[in-house]
Structure formats: structure tokens, C-alpha cells
């Protein structure tokens, strides 16, 4: 044993320090004294003999000499086995090799790489460690499981690299692959595409890429995982849900229903999720639609938290809503005001129907303009000629001309818009060479066949339509349709609240239609009459909740409703306003009775009134008077207070959700109402947008996908996209009120420290930067007016805060600015100290 250890140490002696050698000598000395054996056969052994000279007893014993060789062979592997816990041994195999040095044979342990065609090997004794093995796996095979590596990324907007650590995780990589299939709508068999597989293998040869069947299974598992997360999230939502429902027919001629829920979360951000996208069999009767919708709500356990349902104006939907309300009332779902606010008709669909009725009056002229567009776009050569004329008229050639779609009135508007834009080019094209113009268009174009005579009619039509004087009414028509188009776009948004915009927008449309009825052009008057009939039909049955949403807009309140009521109803407007106020109070009373945190304010009546009530023997009447007294008092403290305050003066874009978020403490019940009412969707665009994705998922090449996997793909994409947006998108709604002072402080610290300012007068000279900071902060005055009541006070506080920051950062004497620091409110001082501590 002594010879084997000493010789092995001599072979590797150049790797060790002399102190380690002394420790080993001491260890050998103790072993020699305890086992009473030992021989010296090499020069280093003679040194050990000299050291052991005071103890000569171990040398004269020859009997243990034949045993040292087998003992290390048995004990050494046992000691090494305890240390073979590293994961590198999954890719290396230990082998013992016998080597001869100076005529003596020794055993060395080497680790051989297990990868094919790799002949790398490294010494595997315990004192060599595993660093060499890991370096080989990382550099030659890109495989070091669990090891942190460095990745380099470009910082956005800067020419610098950001180096961040990352750790390879096979499970995470597989999840990313299946998320890519879902989010980008790749086919399942992409995992079997030859070059895709080669690409993945080039990045990581042992990546476990599987078949399309396995990919489908993983996607279903991911869908169930995300579904469970969403279920838990919806369970914790405190507000009510508004829903949208719509139908769609795929290329398989299968009908799909999409149900989307909308709510305002605790951060007052509007959220939406698709909770159902499934195949509906059989006839689309109202009863079947109601049963399907109710089953979805029960499945997600939100049937008792519904506020409204937005639908198209179909007869089956009318029956479905009636049945849904009855079903929910039977299940004790506690609908708001017994479902009076539940049914919301799609505003965009109403505008579509009204505009189509108006366009039907001038269908002949629309067809002529449509024929002109077809004639121009009938051949590439004709289109090139038009683009040359457009260049000569300094028009944008990339704009193009849209084509009319019979089911979408807005496509008619876009066609008119583009035709009017290219009007100078069309006139130039017509006058350039009429005969050549006719010959170029003698071809078949989609649904139209143009002969020479027919083209003469088309050219004549162009002369009429494009004639400057006679074409003015087309410009008027375009302006009329633009009002419909702009309002449709405004009400189609899903990332912001649209409920408060409906009433004002529809009142403006009604006012315009009334004006068009008296227009000097006969065509416009005919259109206006047709539009007015359809508009009045839906105006009478519009949901009162959308007027409530307008009332909850601090820019309008009850004043806007009174304005339009007086305009439309004349002297009888007060009756309609009083009816609306009664609806508001009824809604307020409902939320007051349901709110556990409703304020219970003491009555303002005199003591004699209380004594009379206490002595009253009619308990029911007494309780009623108490309830009435408390109810009236709460109203006077909150609802009437809101109505009595002046309108908010605000120009530009207004974030109504942020405004109400800052009033939770001031209006606890009204904020609950606003949180539910402002989540109403006035259009079904949110559900219709899912059908565009459905058309790509269930395309002609994948029309055999089952309804279950279709729902998994559509829903998972929607859920992941929403959660991903929540990770990186930070809006003003998500910034707490108290953090604005900290934000201003940090910006001022940047001006003070980073830009090299060392004393207060320098900072006073940089007031332009300070003004820009304040202007950026006051863009959302709905938050800022809670902290800073006007601009100049904010500016004064910011300058004082700047002085305060300069003193702290540069160690100036504090007493000269003591009075300035005293002006700062405590809600600014505390974040200032915290921010400076972190800084």
C-alpha cells in the first residue's frame, strides 16, 4: 500500500504544492506506524526513511510486503465510488489503465467520452476533479446540464450588449416549442419537417423533438394547465363580468360559437379572455344558444357574477337572451336589477344595418363606381397606367383602391374614399386615350364581362362621376359615411372602455341624420330618411346601461344627457331626464344593499323624529323609515355629491378607468358600479376577432381538426397572449398613486446627479427640463390632481424637492432649506428618503 501510494504521488508530484506533500508524508507515517509495514523502493522513499529514523520498528517486518499491492486495488475503488456523484459521469466511462514507470507498474484511472466518434479522455483520479470533463462537454458537445451560461442581447435603442445568465432546461424548451406552434399557428407536423428537425439538432443534438401526435398531446396538456390557471384567477375576481357571444361558420361548413368575458381587474385595467370556442350542432335556435351559453358560465363558475351580454341583432338572439335571464334567475344568480341591464345590442352591427339601408337608396350609383374600380383593376397593364397617372398627379401609389364587399358597408366607404383620392389620376387616365382605355378593358373581370358598348357606358359613367360639379354630392356622401366609419372604429376597441363612448356617439349620429333629412341634395335626403327609420327602431330598445356609462364619465355626467334629451324631445325633456335619474338611483340602491362596505352615515334628522320612530308600534314601518333615512343620507353623501361637482375639463385622450381608480376611497359604491358598467362591450368585435384566428386554424389544409383541439388552440393563444402582454406592458393604470412622487424624485435626481449639477442655482436654470417632467406627469391629471392640485403648485413643490435632493446628494448644510423641506407633504418625503436609500 505504501509503495503504490508513494509512486502514484511521484507521478503527479508536479501538480501539488509542497504543503500537500508534507501532509501526505504525515498520513503515510501514521499508517506505517499503525500497520507496522512499509518499504522504500524509490529516491523519495529514502527521504521518508530518514524522517522515520527515530522509529525503526516498522522496517524489520517483511511479512506484510506481499499484501500492499492487492489492498489499494480493493480500497481505492471504494473511496472513488463515494466521489462519483457528478452528472458528468453520465457521459464518461471510467477505465483503469496499467502503466510502467522506471520498471514498475502502476494503475491509472481515465474517463473516456461516450459520445460517438469522440476519443477524448481525461485523468479520473479524485484529485483531478471534473472541470476538464465539464469543459469538454460544454465546448465539444454543448451539454452541461443545469449550468449557468451567458447570453448576449442588444439593448433596445443602444449599441451595447446586455449579458445575462441563463440555464438550459429541456422542459422549458419543449414548452417554448409548443407555444410557438400555438401562437404562430404552425401545423403540428412542423416537428417532422426535415429541415426544421435538422435546424433543431444543429442547436442541440439530443433535443427530444417528437412526432405530430406527441406535439398534439403536449398542446392539450398546456391548454389544461393554462385553463386551470385562468379558473383560479377568475375565482378571485371581485367585479362582475360582461360577455360577448357570436357565431361563425368554418370552411368545413361547421358552426362555431365564441364566448368572451370582459372585466376590470384590481388594477383597473380592462381584461378579456375567450372561455369557449366550440362546435354547435343542430339548428341555431334561441333555446339551444341559451343552453350552450348557460353551460359555459356554469362550467367556469361565473354564472352568479354576470352583468351584461352583447349580441348581434338576430331574432334567435332575442329569444336566447330571454331564456338566459330566466335560467339565471332560477339559479339565484343575483342579476343586477333583475336583468334590466343584461342585453346589449352590438352597436357596430346597428351602424352596419343603418348604413346599408342608406346605401341601398343609391345602389345604382354604387354599382357604377364599383364597375369603374373593376375596370381599372381588371388587368396589370391598366393598373400600371393608372399608377403612372397617379405619379404625375403627385399621389401615393402604395395606397391602392379597396374593393366593395356586399356584406360590409365599411368596404363601400373605403372604396369611395380611395376612388375620391385617385380622382385626379382617373380623370387623367380617361382623357389620355379613351379608345385605348376601352380596348384595355375588353376582358372578363370577376363577375363582369365588358364589351365595347358596355365599356362606353362605363366611360360615360366615369365622365359623370368624375365631373367636378356633378361629383360634389359624392363628396358629401363620403363625409356622411365617414361619421359612421369613425364611430364604428371607435366602438370596436377591446383594449379600452367603450361603454362611456356609446351614448355620445349615437346621439351625434342621430343629430346628423336629422340634419341630412333637410339637406339640399335630394339623394342625401332620401338616404337620411331610410337611415332614420332603421336608427329609430334600435334607438328605442337600446340598453339604458350605456347611458349610465355616459353618466359615469366625469366629463359629461348628467349634463350631456340633459343636452341631448332637450335637443331630441323639446320641452318634454325633463320627463326623460327624471326617468333616467330614477334608473341611476335604483342601480345605486342595488349596489348599496349588496355592498358590505357601504357607508352607514348617521341621520341628519332631529331628536324628536328619532323619539317618534322609537315609540312607533309599527315595526315594519319603523324599519322602512330607518332604511329610507339611511338611504337618503348615503345618496346625499356620494351620489348627489358626484352629480353636484363640476364637469372635468379635459382635452385629448381620457383614461376613464384611471380616473375612477383614484376615487375608490371617495366614492366606494360608485366605483363598484363604474367597474361593472365600464366593462360592458358595445360591440361583438372581441368575439369576431377570434374567428379570423379560427379561419387560419381551421383552414382548408387542416379542416379535419376536431373541435376539442380547435378550442385548445384558440383559447390557449388568447390566454398566453394576454398574460404575456401583462408581463411587459406597463400602463399608467398600473402605477400606484403614491409612486408618482417617487418617479418625479428619481427624474430630478437624474437631472441633479447624472447631468452634473452641483448646486441649486444650476438646477433653477434648467427649468425647461423640469417643466417637461411636470408636463409628462400631469398628462394623467386624474392621478396627479390627488397629489398636486394645480400646475404651479406642482412646479413649486418640484423645485423644493429638487433643492431637497441636491442637499441630500451633495452633503450641503440643511438649515438654509429647512423651510423649503417643510413645504413638502409627507407622502413625498417618505418616498424621497426610500428612493435615496435605494439609490
Swiss-Prot record:
Polar residues: bias regions: 32-43
Ranges that cross the membrane: none
Flavoprotein recorded as keyword: no
InterPro entries xref list: hAT-like_transposase_RNase-H (IPR025525), HATC_C_dom (IPR008906), RNaseH-like_sf (IPR012337), ZnF_BED_domain_contain (IPR052035)
Domain of life assignment: Eukaryota
Chain segments annotated as coiled-coil in the UniProt record: none
Protein name as catalogued: Putative AC9 transposase
Keyword Aminoacyl-tRNA synthetase: no
Any matching Pfam family: Dimer_Tnp_hAT
The species this protein was found in: Zea mays (Maize)
Keywords: DNA recombination, DNA-binding, Transposable element, Transposition
GO BP term, pick one: transposition
Disulfide bridge partners, by residue number: none
GO terms of molecular function: DNA binding; protein dimerization activity
Additional comment: This protein is coded by the transposable maize controlling element 'activator' (Ac), which is able to activate chromosome breakage at a specific location; it may be the structural gene for a trans-acting function required for transposition.
Residues covered by region (Disordered): 32-85
Amino acid at each position: 500500500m505504501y509503495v503504490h501510494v508513494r509512486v502514484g504521488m511521484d507521478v503527479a508530484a508536479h501538480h501539488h504544492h509542497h504543503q500537500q506533500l508534507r501532509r501526505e508524508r504525515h498520513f503515510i507515517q501514521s499508517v506505517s506506524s499503525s500497520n507496522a509495514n512499509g518499504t522504500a523502493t524509490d529516491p523519495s522513499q529514502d527521504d521518508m526513511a530518514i524522517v522515520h529514523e527515530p522509529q525503526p520498528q516498522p522496517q524489520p517486518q517483511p511479512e506484510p510486503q506481499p499484501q500492499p499491492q492487492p489492498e489499494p486495488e480493493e480500497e481505492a475503488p471504494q473511496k472513488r465510488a463515494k466521489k462519483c456523484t457528478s452528472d458528468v459521469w453520465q457521459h464518461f466511462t471510467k477505465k483503469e489503465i496499467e502503466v510502467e514507470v522506471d520498471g514498475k507498474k502502476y494503475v491509472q484511472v481515465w474517463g473516456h467520452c461516450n459520445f460517438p466518434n469522440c476519443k477524448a479522455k481525461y485523468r479520473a483520479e479524485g484529485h483531478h476533479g471534473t472541470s476538464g470533463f465539464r469543459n469538454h462537454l460544454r465546448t465539444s458537445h454543448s451539454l452541461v446540464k443545469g449550468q449557468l451560461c451567458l447570453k448576449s442581447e442588444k439593448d433596445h435603442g443602444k449599441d451595447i450588449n446586455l449579458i445575462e445568465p441563463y440555464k438550459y432546461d429541456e422542459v422549458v424548451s419543449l414548452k417554448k416549442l409548443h407555444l410557438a406552434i400555438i401562437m404562430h399557428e404552425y401545423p403540428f407536423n412542423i416537428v417532422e419537417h426535415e429541415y426544421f428537425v435538422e435546424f433543431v439538432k444543429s442547436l442541440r443534438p439530443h433535443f427530444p423533438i417528437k412526432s405530430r401526435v406527441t406535439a398534439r398531446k403536449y398542446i392539450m396538456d398546456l391548454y389544461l394547465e393554462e385553463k386551470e390557471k385562468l379558473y383560479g384567477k377568475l375565482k378571485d375576481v371581485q367585479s362582475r363580468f360582461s360577455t360577448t357571444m357570436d357565431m361563425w361558420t368554418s370552411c368545413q361548413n361547421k358552426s362555431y360559437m365564441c364566448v368572451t368575458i370582459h372585466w376590470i381587474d384590481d388594477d383597473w385595467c380592462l381584461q378579456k379572455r375567450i372561455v369557449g370556442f366550440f362546435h354547435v350542432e343542430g339548428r341555431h335556435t334561441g333555446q339551444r344558444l341559451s343552453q350552450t351559453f348557460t353551460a359555459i358560465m356554469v362550467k367556469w363558475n361565473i354564472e352568479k357574477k354576470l352583468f351584461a351580454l352583447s349580441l348581434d341583432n338576430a331574432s334567435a338572439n332575442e329569444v336566447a337572451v330571454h331564456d338566459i335571464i330566466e335560467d339565471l334567475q332560477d339559479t339565484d344568480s343575483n342579476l343586477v336589477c333583475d336583468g334590466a341591464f343584461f342585453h346589449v345590442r352590438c352597436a357596430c352591427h346597428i351602424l352596419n344595418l343603418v348604413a346599408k339601408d342608406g346605401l341601398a337608396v343609391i345602389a345604382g350609383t354604387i354599382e357604377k363606381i364599383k364597375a369603374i374600380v373593376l375596370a381599372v383593376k381588371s388587368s396589370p397593364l391598366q393598373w400600371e397606367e393608372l399608377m403612372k397617372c397617379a405619379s404625375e398627379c403627385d399621389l401615393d401609389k402604395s395606397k391602392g383602391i379597396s374593393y366593395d364587399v356586399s356584406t360590409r358597408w365599411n368596404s363601400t366607404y373605403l372604396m369611395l374614399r380611395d376612388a375620391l383620392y385617385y380622382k385626379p389620376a382617373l380623370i387623367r387616365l380617361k382623357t389620355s386615350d379613351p379608345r385605348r382605355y376601352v380596348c384595355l378593358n375588353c376582358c372578363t373581370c370577376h363577375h363582369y364581362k365588358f364589351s365595347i358598348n358596355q365599356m362606353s357606358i362605363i366611360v360615360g359613367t366615369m365622365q359623370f362621376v368624375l365631373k367636378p360639379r356633378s361629383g360634389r354630392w359624392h363628396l358629401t356622401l363620403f363625409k356622411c359615411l365617414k361619421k359612421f366609419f369613425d364611430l364604428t372604429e371607435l366602438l370596436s376597441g377591446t383594449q379600452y372602455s367603450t361603454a362611456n363612448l356609446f351614448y355620445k356617439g349615437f346621439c351625434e349620429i342621430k343629430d346628423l341624420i336629422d340634419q341630412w333629412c333637410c339637406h339640399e341634395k335630394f339623394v342625401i335626403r332620401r338616404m337620411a330618411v331610410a337611415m332614420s327609420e332603421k336608427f329609430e327602431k334600435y334607438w328605442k330598445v337600446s340598453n339604458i346601461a350605456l347611458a349610465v356609462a355616459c353618466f359615469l364619465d366625469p366629463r359629461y355626467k348628467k349634463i350631456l344627457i340633459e343636452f341631448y334629451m332637450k335637443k331630441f324631445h323639446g320641452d318634454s325633456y325633463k320627463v326623460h331626464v327624471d326617468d333616467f335619474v330614477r334608473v341611476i338611483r335604483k342601480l345605486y340602491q342595488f349596489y348599496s344593499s349588496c355592498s358590505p362596505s357601504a357607508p352607514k352615515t348617521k341621520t341628519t334628522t332631529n331628536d324628536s323624529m328619532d323619539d317618534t320612530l322609537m315609540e312607533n308600534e309599527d315595526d315594519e314601518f319603523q324599519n322602512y323609515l330607518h332604511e329610507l333615512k339611511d338611504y337618503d343620507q348615503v345618496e346625499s353623501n356620494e351620489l348627489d355629491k358626484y352629480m353636484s361637482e363640476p364637469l372635468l375639463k379635459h382635452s385629448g385622450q381620457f383614461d376613464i378607468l384611471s380616473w375612477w381608480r383614484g376615487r375608490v376611497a371617495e366614492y366606494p359604491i360608485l366605483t363598484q358600479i363604474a367597474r361593472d358598467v365600464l366593462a360592458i362591450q358595445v360591440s361583438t368585435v372581441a368575439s369576431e376577432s377570434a374567428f379570423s384566428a379560427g379561419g387560419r386554424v381551421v383552414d382548408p389544409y387542416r379542416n379535419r381538426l376536431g373541435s376539442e383541439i380547435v378550442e385548445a388552440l384558440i383559447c390557449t393563444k388568447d390566454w398566453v397572449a394576454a398574460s404575456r402582454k401583462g408581463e411587459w406592458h406597463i400602463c399608467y393604470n398600473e402605477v400606484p398613486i403614491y409612486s408618482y412622487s417617487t418617479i418625479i424624485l428619481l427624474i430630478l435626481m437624474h437631472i441633479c446627479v447624472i447631468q452634473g449639477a452641483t448646486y441649486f442655482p444650476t438646477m433653477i436654470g434648467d427649468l425647461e427640463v423640469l417643466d417637461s417632467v411636470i408636463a409628462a406627469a400631469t398628462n394623467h391629471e386624474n392621478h396627479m390632481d390627488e397629489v398636486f392640485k394645480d400646475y404651479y403648485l406642482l412646479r413649486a413643490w418640484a423645485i423644493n424637492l429638487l433643492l431637497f435632493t441636491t442637499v441630500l446628494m451633495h452633503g450641503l448644510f440643511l438649515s438654509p432649506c429647512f423651510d423649503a423641506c417643510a413645504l413638502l407633504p409627507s407622502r413625498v418625503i417618505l418616498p424621497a428618503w426610500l428612493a435615496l436609500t435605494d439609490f
